């Protein structure tokens, strides 16, 4: 009896060992397959830096944004990038057939966060360094290579204008950007940054110190960290158009102390607008002022802030009468006002976690541009948008919870998402304008316009029915669950930019000089505004749509008043 029992016990032990071995082999095989999939999906190279690590370069002027249905068919998008996105989206989370806005809002926001992770991993590597023998100027450059110069982030060598392009920066692209704005010199730094100016740096360094390859041009040198590859701009590429030399700003009364208000001047007979603008551009001033035969160059200042314009007929007199009347004509030169272009991450983690919350299409990107240039600190984002990062929003790639940015963009609503923040700026825009702006963005990107076929299709009414209620619930949720709020209306920000922006900056607990606010006002549009208007603007809202939206407007207006805020601006409220 004991012998069979012993045999059975021995068999069970062997079976147990065999099962353990098979389980271990199964787990190891699965792990190896998973690692192989990750290696295929993500580019080879160093690991991405942690969320609190400083990223290598500022953002850019062009590049691939979020991978929507249009980007999947874009030949410029690499197969590796598409494969990586495909790996991150399981079959259960892939988009359903039909327009994107027919999916639930939460599903769309989750996909934004997935894309953030992939873009963070794929773009985190710095620009490749070239060996000393490869450090050479671009062969196809239309400018004259001057040399390699040192640069300082706090005191730029070329101070005229700044552009970024993390994916496509080339020497020709930088030269054209500077030539369009009438600059003489173009400097490239860290493979993706372009600086313009009219004054050549004083001290050069060895050519071997400029050893970073241009992001969009293999084998060409685009400076290095704190090193500029400087070219003299000779001519524009074919098809490029030079910007207007001067834009009329209005007729203004002269300040009391002209010498103090206007740092540079030119007095000559028969001076013209072009002559004065060219002179001030050479001196790197954004304003050219004409008073009779006198030309002055200046920045907007508290003494000369360009807010109290006179009737243009006052400046239409002959030069001598105009000079005696103490009036002047002001023109904007192609030169960028760079007093407020420097930005950085917060030196220490912020103790107050601030949201910049809005409904999509309410001007969140524009508000971020204003806040960044007013405070000098980057703004973050709950999502990742490669197009915004490429346009200079460097905080876009920083983890939204890093607390290294002055505030964090979000379109989220709901108690859990709202209570993660200590305070918030709630940006509200007329829902009619917001819905049109967001529909344009979804159909044609940040700077484009939806085609007529989009407005006439079933996509537009489906979009309105889905998103109009979100406009209302977004405001109501933030009023209900927000711990500390500042309500800002987009229309008021456009009408009274400096006072409203001053209030926003004070809410963020940042001290800002009046000169910096005036600089922001001078550069208020930035690079993310739809230029011009459509040849014909359709009336997209049917009477049924208007009844629906007007009901939401009344609800939000009453909720604001119930929470001791002023109601919506009069142009929102239906009459």
Swiss-Prot record:
<keyword id="KW-0735">Signal-anchor</keyword>
<keyword id="KW-0472">Membrane</keyword>
<dbReference type="InterPro" id="IPR027417">
    <property type="entry name" value="P-loop_NTPase"/>
</dbReference>
<keyword id="KW-0333">Golgi apparatus</keyword>
<feature type="domain" description="WSC 1">
    <location>
        <begin position="142"/>
        <end position="234"/>
    </location>
</feature>
<keyword id="KW-0677">Repeat</keyword>
<dbReference type="GO" id="GO:0000139">
    <property type="term" value="C:Golgi membrane"/>
</dbReference>
<dbReference type="InterPro" id="IPR002889">
    <property type="entry name" value="WSC_carb-bd"/>
</dbReference>
<keyword id="KW-0325">Glycoprotein</keyword>
<dbReference type="Pfam" id="PF01822">
    <property type="entry name" value="WSC"/>
</dbReference>
<dbReference type="InterPro" id="IPR051589">
    <property type="entry name" value="Sialate-O-sulfotransferase"/>
</dbReference>
<keyword id="KW-0812">Transmembrane</keyword>
<keyword id="KW-1133">Transmembrane helix</keyword>
<comment type="similarity">
    <text>Belongs to the WSCD family.</text>
</comment>
<feature type="domain" description="WSC 2">
    <location>
        <begin position="245"/>
        <end position="340"/>
    </location>
</feature>
<feature type="glycosylation site" description="N-linked (GlcNAc...) asparagine">
    <location>
        <position position="348"/>
    </location>
</feature>
<dbReference type="GO" id="GO:0008146">
    <property type="term" value="F:sulfotransferase activity"/>
</dbReference>
<dbReference type="InterPro" id="IPR000863">
    <property type="entry name" value="Sulfotransferase_dom"/>
</dbReference>
<feature type="transmembrane region" description="Helical; Signal-anchor for type II membrane protein">
    <location>
        <begin position="15"/>
        <end position="35"/>
    </location>
</feature>
<comment type="function">
    <text>Sialate:O-sulfotransferase which catalyzes 8-O-sulfation at the Sia-glycan level using 3'-phosphoadenosine 5'-phosphosulfate (PAPS) as a donor, forming 8-O-sulfated Sia (Sia8S)-glycans. Displays selectivity toward glycolipids such as GM1 gangliosides.</text>
</comment>
<protein>
    <recommendedName>
        <fullName>Sialate:O-sulfotransferase 1</fullName>
    </recommendedName>
</protein>
<feature type="glycosylation site" description="N-linked (GlcNAc...) asparagine">
    <location>
        <position position="257"/>
    </location>
</feature>
<feature type="topological domain" description="Extracellular">
    <location>
        <begin position="36"/>
        <end position="575"/>
    </location>
</feature>
<feature type="topological domain" description="Cytoplasmic">
    <location>
        <begin position="1"/>
        <end position="14"/>
    </location>
</feature>
<dbReference type="Pfam" id="PF00685">
    <property type="entry name" value="Sulfotransfer_1"/>
</dbReference>
């Amino acid at each position: 009896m004991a012998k069979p029992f012993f045999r059975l016990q021995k068999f069970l032990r062997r079976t147990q060992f065999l099962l353990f071995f098979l389980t271990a082999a199964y787990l190891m095989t699965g792990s190896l397959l998973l690692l192989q999939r990750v290696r295929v999906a993500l580019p080879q190279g160093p690991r991405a830096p942690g969320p609190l690590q400083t990223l290598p370069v500022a953002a850019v002027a062009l590049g691939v944004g979020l991978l929507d249905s249009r980007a999947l068919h874009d030949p410029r998008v690499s197969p590796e990038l598409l494969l990586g996105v495909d790996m991150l989206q399981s079959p259960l989370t892939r988009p359903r057939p039909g327009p994107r806005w027919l999916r639930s809002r939460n599903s769309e926001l989750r996909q934004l966060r997935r894309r953030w992770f992939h873009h963070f991993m794929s773009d985190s590597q710095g620009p490749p360094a070239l060996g000393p023998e490869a450090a050479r100027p671009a062969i196809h450059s239309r400018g004259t290579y001057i040399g390699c110069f040192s640069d300082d982030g706090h005191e730029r060598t070329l101070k005229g204008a700044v552009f970024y392009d993390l994916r496509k920066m080339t020497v020709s692209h930088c030269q054209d950007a500077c030539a369009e704005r009438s600059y003489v010199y173009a400097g490239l730094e860290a493979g993706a940054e372009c600086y313009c100016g009219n004054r050549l740096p004083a001290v050069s360094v060895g050519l071997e110190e400029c050893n970073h390859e241009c992001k969009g041009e293999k084998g060409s040198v685009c400076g290095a960290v704190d090193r500029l590859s400087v070219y003299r701009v000779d001519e524009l590429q074919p098809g490029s158009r030079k910007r207007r030399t001067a834009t009329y700003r209005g007729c203004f009364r002269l300040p009391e102390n002209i010498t103090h208000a206007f740092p540079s001047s030119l007095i000559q007979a028969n001076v013209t607008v072009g002559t004065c603008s060219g002179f001030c551009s050479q001196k790197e001033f954004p304003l050219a002022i004409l008073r009779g035969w006198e030309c002055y160059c200046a920045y907007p200042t508290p003494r000369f802030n360009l807010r109290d314009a006179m009737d243009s007929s006052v400046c239409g007199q002959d030069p001598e009468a105009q000079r005696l009347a103490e009036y002047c004509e002001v023109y904007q030169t192609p030169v960028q006002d760079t007093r407020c272009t420097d930005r950085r991450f917060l030196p220490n983690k912020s103790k107050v976690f601030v949201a910049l919350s809005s409904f999509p299409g309410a001007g969140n990107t524009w508000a971020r541009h204003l806040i960044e240039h007013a405070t000098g600190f980057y703004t973050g984002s709950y999502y990742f948008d490669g197009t915004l990062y490429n346009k200079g929003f460097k905080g876009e790639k920083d983890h939204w919870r890093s607390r290294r940015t002055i505030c964090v963009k979000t379109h989220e609503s709901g108690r859990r998402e709202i209570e993660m923040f200590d305070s918030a700026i709630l940006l509200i825009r007329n829902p009619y304008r917001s819905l049109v702006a967001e529909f344009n963005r979804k159909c044609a990107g940040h700077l484009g316009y939806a085609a007529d076929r989009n407005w006439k299709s079933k996509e537009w009414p489906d979009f309105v029915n889905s998103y109009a209620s979100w406009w209302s619930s977004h405001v109501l949720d933030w009023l209900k669950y927000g711990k500390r709020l500042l309500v800002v209306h987009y229309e008021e920000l456009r009408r009274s930019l400096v006072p409203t922006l001053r209030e926003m900056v004070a809410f963020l607990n940042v001290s800002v000089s009046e000169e910096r606010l005036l600089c922001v006002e001078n550069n208020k549009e930035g690079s993310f505004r739809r230029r011009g208007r459509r040849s014909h603007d359709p009336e997209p809202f049917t009477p049924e749509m208007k009844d629906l939206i007007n009901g939401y407007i009344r609800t939000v207006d009453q909720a604001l008043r119930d929470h001791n805020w002023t109601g919506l601006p009069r142009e929102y409220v239906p009459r």
